[in-house]
Amino acid sequence: MAEKTITVEEVLKHNTRDDLYIVVKDKVYDISKFLDAHPGGEEVLVDLAGRDASGPFEDVGHSEDAQELLEKFYIGNLLRTEDGPQLPTTGAAAGGSGYDSSQPVKPAMWLFVLVMVVAYFAFRKYVLK
């Protein structure tokens, strides 16, 4: 029997606490019934609803037991198309905070930090004599 394929459009529809799909390594999982049992709390999973959770899943370093448990919720393989919608992975569009840790710190931020450090030491040297 051929494995079921699930489109990106379908995954995007399942993004609520009661109806929650995630994708890990192009496999789709319906984890709606696992929320209460998740050791990291349900909010972690709700934040990943309807999106590609491969990065966060790998970053946590789940045990083999956790990986085996995930397979119990497997419902099919993700069908990606070039011209179709893409699954969000990070940022506000995906329901996250909007912070993307993969982006480098901008030079202006480094300049700000440098100015603050210099100001701190100047204050200590000249004001707090």
Swiss-Prot record:
GO terms for molecular function: electron transfer activity; heme binding; metal ion binding. Its main location: endoplasmic reticulum. SMART domains: Cyt-b5. The chain crosses the membrane at residues 105-125. Heme binds at H38, H62. It is found in: Endoplasmic reticulum membrane; Microsome membrane; Mitochondrion. GO terms for biological process: ergosterol biosynthetic process. It is a single-pass membrane protein. SUPFAM superfamilies: Cytochrome b5-like heme/steroid binding domain. InterPro entries: Cyt_B5-like_heme/steroid-bd, Cyt_B5-like_heme/steroid_sf, Cyt_B5_heme-BS, Cytochrome_b5. GO terms for cellular component: endoplasmic reticulum membrane; intracellular membrane-bounded organelle; mitochondrion. Residues 3-79 form the Cytochrome b5 heme-binding domain. Keywords: Electron transport, Endoplasmic reticulum, Heme, Iron, Membrane, Metal-binding, Microsome, Mitochondrion, Transmembrane, Transmembrane helix, Transport. Membrane bound hemoprotein which function as an electron carrier for several membrane bound oxygenases. Belongs to the cytochrome b5 family. This is Probable cytochrome b5 2. It comes from Schizosaccharomyces pombe (strain 972 / ATCC 24843) (Fission yeast). The lineage of its organism: Eukaryota, Fungi, Dikarya, Ascomycota, Taphrinomycotina. The gene is oca8.
